[in-house]
């Protein structure tokens, strides 16, 4: 009878979640909130930009293709700060609306770079770490990851690869669909990815501008990621330089600088030292 009552109580009142599970759930909800808020802000921004261009089309000057494609293209070119100049406001009304569009775009871009990009990079790093931890080769794990994080040099490699992929895909598209030669294709792709946007070469077809809507957004995120990692590397170097070195650290640094020992040698010595600490001292 007592066992039945206990079973019924467990069924009616399941065990409460542990603090760790509650914390993980809270963090997960917070991350999803960031992404949802970013999508809402981007949707509101694009809606405002598209409406501005669509309702006041006659008050903009530039090359026309398709109304809605041009509207999205104008919004993304403004948001990404590329600013080709192929579509520009020509009246006081559209200039005021463009000022509002640019101002809100700067605020949202700051949120996108500081919150969303950091969150996406964290997800990417966790996914890569999961793949690395599954490998049986410990040397590969130690070479790529350290203290549960991917080494900064590998993050930079991934960021450079992402930027290179954006440049390459953009150049290929420009050569095939915009009929530019290879030099101009690479030139416009680099100018766009780096958000310089001189305006001497631009997207002029419906297909090109439709591609630019997505490509410029991804390229802006890729460049922001690269800048974040470069800034992180500079901060790390500055922090290390400001730390007061001990005599042993200086000796290890000089040996490593001269090539007499490698990073793997240092790690092996550290492991031996840690194993030595774990061995209990024998009593007398």
Swiss-Prot record:
Any one GO molecular-function label of the UniProt entry: potassium channel activity
Which tissues is this chain's protein expressed in?
Predominantly expressed in pollen.
- Describe its membrane topology: Multi-pass membrane protein
- Specify the domain of life of the species encoding this protein: Eukaryota
Keywords of this protein's UniProt record, alphabetized? Cell membrane, Ion channel, Ion transport, Membrane, Potassium, Potassium channel, Potassium transport, Transmembrane, Transmembrane helix, Transport
Q: InterPro entries given for it?
A: 2pore_dom_K_chnl, K_chnl_dom
Q: Which residues lie within the membrane without crossing it?
A: 70-89, 184-203
Q: Which residues cross the membrane?
A: 32-52, 93-113, 157-177, 211-231
The entry's localization annotation reads: Cell membrane
- What residue spans carry the region label Disordered? 1-21
Q: Null-mutant phenotype, please?
A: No effect on pollen germination rate and growth.
Cystine crosslinks: none
Record topological domains on the Cytoplasmic side: 1-31, 114-156, 232-284
A GO cellular-component term linked to this record? vacuolar membrane
On subunit structure and binding partners, the annotation says: Homodimer.
What's in the domain note? Each of the two pore-forming region (also called P-domain or P-loop) is enclosed by two transmembrane segments (2P/4TM) and contains the GYGD signature motif which seems to be involved in potassium selectivity.
| Sequence similarity | Belongs to the two pore domain potassium channel (TC 1.A.1.7) family.
What functional role does this protein have?
Answer: Voltage-independent, instantaneously activating, potassium-selective plasma membrane ion channel. Open rectifier. Regulated by cytoplasmic pH and extra-cellular calcium. Has some permeability for Rb(+) and NH(4)(+), but none for Na(+) or Li(+).
- Please give the name of this protein: Two-pore potassium channel 4
């Amino acid at each position: 009878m007592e066992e039945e009552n206990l079973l019924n109580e467990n069924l009616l009142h399941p065990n409460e979640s542990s603090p760790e599970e509650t914390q993980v759930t809270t963090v997960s909800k917070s991350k999803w909130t960031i992404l949802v808020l970013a999508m809402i802000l981007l949707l509101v921004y694009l809606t405002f930009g598209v409406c501005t261009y669509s309702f006041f089309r006659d008050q903009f000057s530039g090359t026309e293709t398709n109304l809605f494609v041009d509207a999205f293209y104008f919004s993304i070119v403004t948001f990404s700060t590329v600013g080709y100049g192929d579509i520009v406001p020509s009246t006081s009304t559209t200039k005021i609306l463009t000022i509002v569009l640019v101002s809100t775009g700067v605020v949202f871009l700051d949120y996108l770079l500081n919150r969303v990009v950091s969150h996406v990079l964290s997800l990417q790093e966790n996914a890569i770490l999961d793949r690395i931890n599954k490998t049986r080769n410990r040397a590969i794990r130690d070479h790529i990851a350290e203290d549960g994080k991917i080494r900064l040099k590998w993050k930079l490699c991934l960021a450079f690869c992402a930027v290179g992929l954006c440049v390459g895909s953009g150049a290929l598209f420009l050569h095939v669909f915009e009929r530019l030669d290879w030099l101009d294709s690479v030139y416009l792709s680099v100018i766009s990815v780096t958000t310089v946007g001189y305006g001497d070469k631009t997207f002029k077809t419906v297909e090109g501008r439709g591609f630019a809507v997505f490509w410029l957004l991804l390229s802006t995120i890729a460049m922001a990621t690269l800048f974040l990692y470069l800034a992180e590397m500079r901060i790390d170097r500055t922090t290390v330089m400001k730390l007061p070195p001990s005599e042993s650290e200086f000796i290890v640094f000089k040996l490593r600088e001269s090539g007499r020992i490698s990073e793997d040698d240092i790690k092996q010595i550290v492991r031996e030292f840690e194993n030595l600490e774990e061995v209990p001292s024998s009593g007398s």
